[in-house]
Each structure stands twice: as structure tokens, then as C-alpha cells.
UniProtKB/Swiss-Prot annotation:
One of its GO terms (cellular component) is cytoplasm. The keyword Chaperone applies. ATP binds at D23, G24, T25, T26, T27. This is Chaperonin GroEL. Belongs to the chaperonin (HSP60) family. GO terms for biological process: protein refolding. It catalyses: ATP + H2O + a folded polypeptide = ADP + phosphate + an unfolded polypeptide. Keywords: ATP-binding, Chaperone, Cytoplasm, Isomerase, Nucleotide-binding, Stress response. SUPFAM superfamilies: GroEL equatorial domain-like (SSF48592). The gene is groEL.
């Protein structure tokens, strides 16, 4: 029963990460799996589950605060291209994304679809 709860939790973490950030699902899944595994181990060893939950929540608050302090806005076309190129693993795709974002603006929507047409 606990394994099923843990699997559902990890699945939900991956879905929320994808919905909010669109990236980072692997990292979020690995972190969630480690938290579930170590949490169950600690509870089995006698730790208070509510105390454990409160500790995790405090850690999440502190980590979020630290990340937000070090975050940098991505504003210029060049910054967008560099960031997109890292995510895509390809500079030419990063440039295409930056160009598309330049055309639609900050509130615009870009839809990417796989083509079944060879060479287009």
C-alpha cells in the first residue's frame, strides 16, 4: 500500500513539474523518489511522520527562498536563445525559439508539433 502511495506521489510531482515549468521532470522525479524512500525508512525506524513532514516543508521553503534569490530574469533575445539552446541541446533550435518568442511577445503562445513530412 505504501509503495502505491509513493508511486502516485512521484507521478503527481512529475505532472506538476511539467505543467508549471515544462522541464525538470527527471530531477523532480528523482528527488521525490528519494524523499519517499528515505521518509519511509525514517518512519519505519520510529520517526514521527508529522515531524518529518514539517521538516520537509521547512526545507522546501528555505530551498525555494534560496533559489528565488539566485534566479535571474531571461529578457533579451540572446538570453532566450541561450537558455532554449541548453534545454534543446541544439543552438539552432534555441535560435528558432528565440525568434518565435520575439514575434509573439511575452504573453504569446508557441506551439511545436512533430511533422510527418520528410524534410519540411
Amino acid at each position: 500500500p505504501y509503495e502505491k502511495i509513493g508511486a502516485e506521489l512521484v507521478k503527481e510531482v512529475a505532472k506538476k513539474t511539467d505543467d508549471v515549468a515544462g522541464d525538470g521532470t527527471t530531477t523532480a522525479t528523482v528527488l521525490a523518489q528519494a524523499l519517499v524512500k528515505e521518509g519511509l525508512r525514517n518512519v519505519a525506524a520510529g520517526a514521527n511522520p508529522l515531524g518529518l513532514k514539517r521538516g520537509i516543508e521547512k526545507a522546501v521553503e528555505k530551498i525555494t527562498e534560496t533559489l528565488l534569490k539566485s534566479a535571474k530574469d531571461v529578457e533579451t533575445k540572446e538570453q532566450i536563445a541561450a537558455t532554449a539552446a541548453i534545454s534543446a541541446g541544439d543552438q539552432s533550435i534555441g535560435d528558432l525559439i528565440a525568434e518565435a518568442m520575439d514575434k509573439v511577445g511575452n504573453e504569446g503562445v508557441i506551439t511545436v508539433e512533430e511533422s510527418n513530412t520528410f524534410g519540411l
